[in-house]
């Protein structure tokens, strides 16, 4: 069966069992039984409780839960309580950040306009839009939202803004004509789509689809079927948790074997190994990552980027491809006059001379032959026409004043058959008809031309020159209008027969121009190793022209259309995408396929957009970025991040923030693991030497709550470096636990463990196990506090300004040092913390052992840096 747009209006009415006077009540009832209500199906909502429990799915969190259970069974209630508190805080933070993540379908429902004007059995009635059924005849005029999909059956110069659905920046001229060939959504000019707006004219349409069967409904279906992907950080932390578990199990097995070999009871050896394994897991890691990302969201909100899904903060830092919508994202979403062509010369809009009679005449005529208004910044009318009156405003010529001076006395409205509009005015004591329209059509009706020497007969050479200029404008992606005029006898009623013997005045070329900052932002992306790609519903020539201006496209061969994608298999598209920078005339399904093709090539994809048509791809992308000012609610709700200034450059800043945050999270992980490894080594050395265990359970509890958490969080807010934008994006499958990273953790943990063991032996030989345990506890706590400064950078920082540039780390150090000093020196606390009270000399010894780890590790960093530079040479 033919598509609806391929059938005549009469055939469509017959197909939906309707007539021009509308449906009867009985027909409405039958149609509703068959097609349902005109509303979007609502997906099953997750409760806050479900979202809360989903936070416990991470592998590392599951290990922590198991650790808490085992600790409780072994009688270590303090450790079990700490673990439970930490993972509960993490779950609460995660729930707060994600509780609004599933609102896309609610926003889509808002697009089903609240009311509609309908013919029911020949009578015009106003109804809630949800009551529309297939076969209803709807009445439309300028300003109306279209309540359902339909086929036009009556047209009076109807123009519709479909930009939110198709990406087309210009209002679409609607036509009654039947379209014989297959056509993409944006080219179905005899169809009307739910959620679009009428900008001009009047019309009637018969409803052909309602609810989930409309084009907006299909997008709702795509949103439901599009799965959300893990961000690189989520994948990395899962991988990290699994690898860490394996390492800890191996270590526990070795320790258990050693203990049994030394003659200890199997049960005692097992409990000791498990208790140590629980201590080895960085319980605070998940919470610290969540807190650091939350701080990142606050910083980015100040820089015009609101994060709706927490993991997107880091995910942006690993983006390798940005698929950007054109209209309203890279461009201003506002038609603007770019050039004039008059008397054989091209003049830019910035260089118009209003003192020149011809240029002023063209400016005035473009305001007079125009139905749009701009009052107090509120634009009403066709975007092309508002661009013309806005140009006048730039030069201090207000439309109201010109129209009052030369009042309109007649008009012939625009229609798609004539491709022109005419208005009649009293100018210089003459009746003058101004005609604007398509260049080709008006040249056919022109027999004279205005020049600086006066009006003369137009020649073929003149027409060829005008056509060449028109083609030049078109190749630059500009929309061109021709302006002509002629004198009309007084008291004459205008007819279309008057539209001939015209005087050619000039051309006006306009476009939706790029944002001023787009070019610099694209260049910054390319420098950072990120591939910018334009995906739009607009025409190929227009899209390519914009892309070339801002540096996305270099040759027209890098541009293609949705029809090209339609004929490709997924495998073919996957091989095709690296060669294409601009995709034009694409559907929502095409956008998802393009994003998925890049993802299958191992890329981390960000998709930006503002329209309804962008929502499914925003959700499919690794990071969806919506425009906050011009964006639809649908796009915002489907996205992970919303830009409050609609500025493409904000994305670049977000990428920089994301890369720095990932680096800071690595510093925090390095700090936690190297400190834990140092503690494990101290316990292992003591065990192998037949000495008492250096730490009491309360010591590990104190370390977990204080010397772990505060410095790790402070490292997470380490001041950012712009140098990260000189690097290529990291690989999507790059693990946090690289060999180099594990090597650094092992080496730094060895130093901390060594100094802790020296402290333990010093105290043990002075006055037995309790003093040794006190020395070990104090040395480990303080060494970890000093170690926070080691983890600020991969390079030595001890003699640089960077050593002191993190006030939060300094605060964490001072607070931690004061608390551990109080615990070690105040007599009343020794029983609670299972320590001996230290005198000043003993405390100084503990501080000295702890501080020694700082210069040793800084020296190791310096040696490693020199060796790396030598290898590079």
Task: Set out the residue ranges of the language-model regions.
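Membrane-water interface at loop-to-transmembrane-helix junctions
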Residues: 731-750, 770-775
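Alpha-helix capping/termination and helix-coil
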Residues: 370, 602, 655, 659, ...
């Amino acid at each position: 069966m033919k598509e609806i747009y391929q059938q005549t209006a009469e055939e469509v009415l017959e197909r939906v069992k309707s007539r021009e006077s509308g449906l009867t009540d009985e027909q409405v009832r039958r149609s509703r039984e068959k097609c349902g209500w005109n509303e979007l199906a609502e997906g099953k909502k997750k409760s806050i409780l479900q979202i809360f429990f989903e936070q416990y799915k991470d592998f590392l969190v599951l290990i922590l839960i198991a650790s808490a259970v085992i600790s409780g069974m072994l009688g270590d209630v303090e450790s079990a309580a700490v673990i439970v508190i930490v993972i509960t805080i993490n779950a609460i933070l995660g729930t707060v950040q994600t509780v609004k993540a599933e609102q896309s379908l609610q926003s889509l429902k808002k697009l089903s306009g609240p009311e509609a004007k309908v013919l029911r059995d020949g009578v015009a009635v106003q109804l809630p839009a949800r009551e529309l059924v297939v076969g209803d005849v709807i009445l439309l005029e300028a300003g109306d939202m279209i309540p359902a999909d339909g086929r036009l059956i009556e047209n009076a110069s109807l123009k519709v803004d479909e930009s939110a659905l198709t990406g087309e920046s210009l209002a679409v001229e609607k036509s009654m004509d039947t379209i014989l060939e297959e056509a993409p959504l944006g080219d179905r000019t005899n169809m009307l789509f739910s959620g679009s707006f009428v900008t001009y004219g009047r019309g009637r349409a018969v409803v052909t689809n309602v609810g989930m069967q409309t084009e907006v409904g299909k997008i709702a279906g795509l949103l439901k079927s599009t799965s959300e992907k893990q961000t690189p950080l989520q994948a990395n932390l899962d991988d990290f948790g699994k690898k860490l578990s394996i390492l800890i199990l191996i270590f526990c097995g070795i320790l258990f074997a050693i203990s049994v070999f030394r003659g200890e009871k199997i049960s005692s050896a097992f409990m000791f190994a498990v208790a140590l394994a629980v201590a080895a897991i960085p319980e605070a890691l998940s919470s610290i990552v969540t807190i650091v990302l939350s701080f990142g969201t606050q910083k980015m909100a100040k820089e015009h980027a609101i994060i709706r899904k927490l993991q997107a903060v880091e995910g942006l830092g690993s983006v390798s491809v940005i698929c950007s919508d054109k209209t309203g994202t890279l461009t201003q979403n506002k038609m603007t006059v770019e050039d004039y062509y008059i008397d054989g010369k091209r003049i830019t809009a910035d260089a118009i001379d209003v003192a020149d009679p011809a240029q002023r005449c063209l400016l005035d005529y473009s305001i007079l032959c125009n139905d749009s208004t701009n009052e107090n910044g509120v634009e009403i009318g066709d975007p092309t026409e508002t661009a013309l009156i806005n140009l006048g405003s730039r030069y201090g010529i207000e439309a109201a004043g010109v129209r009052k001076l030369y009042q309109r006395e007649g008009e012939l409205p625009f229609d798609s058959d004539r491709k022109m509009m005419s208005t009649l005015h009293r100018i210089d004591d003459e009746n003058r008809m101004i005609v604007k329209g398509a260049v080709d059509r008006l040249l056919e009706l022109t027999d004279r031309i205005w020049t600086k020497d006066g009006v003369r007969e137009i020649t073929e050479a003149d027409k060829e020159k005008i056509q060449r200029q028109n083609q030049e404008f078109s190749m630059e992606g500009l929309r061109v209008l021709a302006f002509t005029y002629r004198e009309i006898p007084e008291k004459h009623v205008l007819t279309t027969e008057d539209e001939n013997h015209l005087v050619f005045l000039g051309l006006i070329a306009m476009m939706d121009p790029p944002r001023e900052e787009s070019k610099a932002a694209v260049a910054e992306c390319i420098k950072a190793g990120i591939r910018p790609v334009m995906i739009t519903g607009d025409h190929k020539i227009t899209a390519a022209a914009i892309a070339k201006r801002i540096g996305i496209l270099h040759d027209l061969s890098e541009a293609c259309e949705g029809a090209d994608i339609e004929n490709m298999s997924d495998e073919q598209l996957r091989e095709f995408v690296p060669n294409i920078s601009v995709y034009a005339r694409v559907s929502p399904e095409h956008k998802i396929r393009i994003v998925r093709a890049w993802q299958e090539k191992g890329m981390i994809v960000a998709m930006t957009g503002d329209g309804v048509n962008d929502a499914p791809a925003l959700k499919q992308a690794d990071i969806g970025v919506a425009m906050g000012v011009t964006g639809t609610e649908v796009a915002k709700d489907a996205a992970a991040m919303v830009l409050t200034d609609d500025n493409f450059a904000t994305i670049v800043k977000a990428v920089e923030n994301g890369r720095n945050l990932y680096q800071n999270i690595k510093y925090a992980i390095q700090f936690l693991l190297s400190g834990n490894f140092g503690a494990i080594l101290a316990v292992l050395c003591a065990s192998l030497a037949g000495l008492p265990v250096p730490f009491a359970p309360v010591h590990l509890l104190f370390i977990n709550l204080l010397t772990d958490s505060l410095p790790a969080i402070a490292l997470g807010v380490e001041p950012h470096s712009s140098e990260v934008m000189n690097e290529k994006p990291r690989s999507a499958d790059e693990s946090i636990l690289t060999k180099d990273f594990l090597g650094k953790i092992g080496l730094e943990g060895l130093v901390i463990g060594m100094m802790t063991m020296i402290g333990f032996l010093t105290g043990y030989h002075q006055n037995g196990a309790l003093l040794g345990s006190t020395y070990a506890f104090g040395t480990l706590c303080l060494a970890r506090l000093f170690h926070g400064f080691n983890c600020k950078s991969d390079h030595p920082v001890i003699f640089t300004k960077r050593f002191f540039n993190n006030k939060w780390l300094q605060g964490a150090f001072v607070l931690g040092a004061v608390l551990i000093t109080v615990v070690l020196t105040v007599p009343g606390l020794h029983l609670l913390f299972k320590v001996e009270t230290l005198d000043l000399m003993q405390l100084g010894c503990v501080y000295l052992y702890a501080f020694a780890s700082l210069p040793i590790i800084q020296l190791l960093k310096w040696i490693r840096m020199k060796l790396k530079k030598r290898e590079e040479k």
